[in-house]
Swiss-Prot record:
It comes from Helicobacter acinonychis (strain Sheeba). Mg(2+) 2 binds at residues 303, 305. This is D-alanine--D-alanine ligase. ATP binds at residues 164-219. The lineage of its organism: Bacteria, Pseudomonadati, Campylobacterota, Epsilonproteobacteria, Campylobacterales. It is found in: Cytoplasm. Its EC number is 6.3.2.4. Residues 135-335 form the ATP-grasp domain. Pfam families: Dala_Dala_lig_C, Dala_Dala_lig_N. Its cofactor is Mg(2+); Mn(2+). It comes from the Bacteria. Cell wall formation. One of its GO terms (molecular function) is ATP binding.
């Protein structure tokens, strides 16, 4: 049986969602999770007892006096009256949504300290956290995406002039750097634009404008690469109205099993082929979820979710086996052997 530790929390707008994800994953993996490591908004690490992994505990966590830990090589450092003690960690699951977890900070830190983990590596995190870069990446691979306009604080005042030549009302306003539907809105008329931009700029320094397309079909597909083969979840067709907002995506606790999409085999194969293009080889070591649109029988990438909620376990027929197999197929960074031969040669020639 493979043991795991789960890292969750973080200095992120999705801090609470990460907690919910960790609680949900506990119900799936149960005793396979040896440690729960909580990262607070001040970047302090804490060990949380499994018995405390429930919403009531975290609602009052600021009142708790927990001993902070320090990340070190291969584990965590815990100080006590007997001196410092290293807690060796089993394979870590990065379950920090949004900033810190999905933007590459934690991936960089874990790689630096040589802590083995399941999750997107630095380059994959940085790219997928930026929606505009994701579109450029996808187009370069031959995966279609919706056209967009990128706004920032400098051109924000001229937003309508930039949008009008390309898009009619309604259109979608969304933060460029964000890991969820926070700050996303549909603008149906000109008077709604300023408010929508205010909301989006709260979460990101850049904002994307995309066309809003009526009656678009949306499909989600999760998966990972294990050695040379892909392991896919089934395709989910979200039950939505206009689009999945923050509450629908994250606060629906009944989402233990998602509705399976009733689609032709040919469309499922198209979704899988697009997923493979996006995953290879950038996302090695991670379970990701790709959210697709189907418009006029054409497949478009909506976004790549590098750390889906609870690792999208609800989409897999056998999530535990998938996770255990992935644990045996993680990318390895070769250790550099420093020989100092050049310095020795300098000394020899003196």
């Amino acid at each position: 049986m493979v043991e795991f530790c789960v890292l969750f929390g973080g200095a992120s707008f999705e801090h609470e969602i990460s907690i919910v994800s960790a609680i949900a994953l506990k119900e799936v993996l149960k005793d396979q999770i040896k440690y729960f490591i909580f990262l607070d908004e001040n970047h302090h690490f804490y060990l949380i007892e499994a018995s405390n992994m429930h919403s009531k505990y975290f609602a009052q966590i600021k009142e708790k006096k927990l001993p902070p830990l320090m990340l070190t090589h291969n584990g965590l450092l815990k100080n006590s009256f007997l001196g410092a003690k290293t807690i060796e960690l089993p394979l870590m699951i990065n379950l920090v949504h949004g900033g810190d977890g999905e933007d590459g900070k934690l991936a960089s830190l874990l790689e630096f300290y040589r802590i083995a983990f399941i999750g997107s590596r630095v380059e994959a995190s940085v790219l997928s956290y930026n929606k505009h870069l994701t579109k450029l990446y996808a187009k370069n691979l031959g995966v279609k995406t919706l056209d967009c306009i990128l706004l920032n604080e400098k051109n924000r005042a001229n937003a309508l002039d930039l949008i009008k030549p390309s898009f009619n009302f309604p259109f979608i306003v969304k933060p460029n750097n964000a890991g969820s539907s926070l700050g996303v809105s549909v603008v149906k008329e000109e008077k709604e634009l300023a408010y929508a931009l205010d909301g989006a700029f709260e979460y990101s320094k850049e904002v994307l404008i995309e066309p809003f397309i009526q009656r678009v079909k949306e499909y989600n597909l999760a998966g990972c690469k294990i050695k040379e083969d892909f392991c896919f979840s089934y395709v989910e067709e979200p039950n939505k109205q206009e689009f999945l907002d923050f509450k629908q995506k994250y606060l629906d606790f009944s989402r233990t099993k998602a509705p399976k999409a009733n689609i032709p085999n040919a469309l499922e194969e198209q979704l899988r082929e697009n997923f493979k293009k996006l995953y290879n080889d950038l996302f090695d070591g991670a379970i990701i979820r790709c959210d697709f649109f189907v418009i006029d029988n054409e497949v478009y990438l909506n976004e790549i979710n590098p750390i889906p909620g609870s690792l999208a376990n609800y989409l897999f027929d056998d999530f535990k086996t998938t996770l255990e197999n992935l644990a045996q197929s993680l990318p390895k960074t070769p250790k550099i052997q420093v020989k100092n031969s050049y310095l020795l040669q300098i000394q020899k020639n003196k």
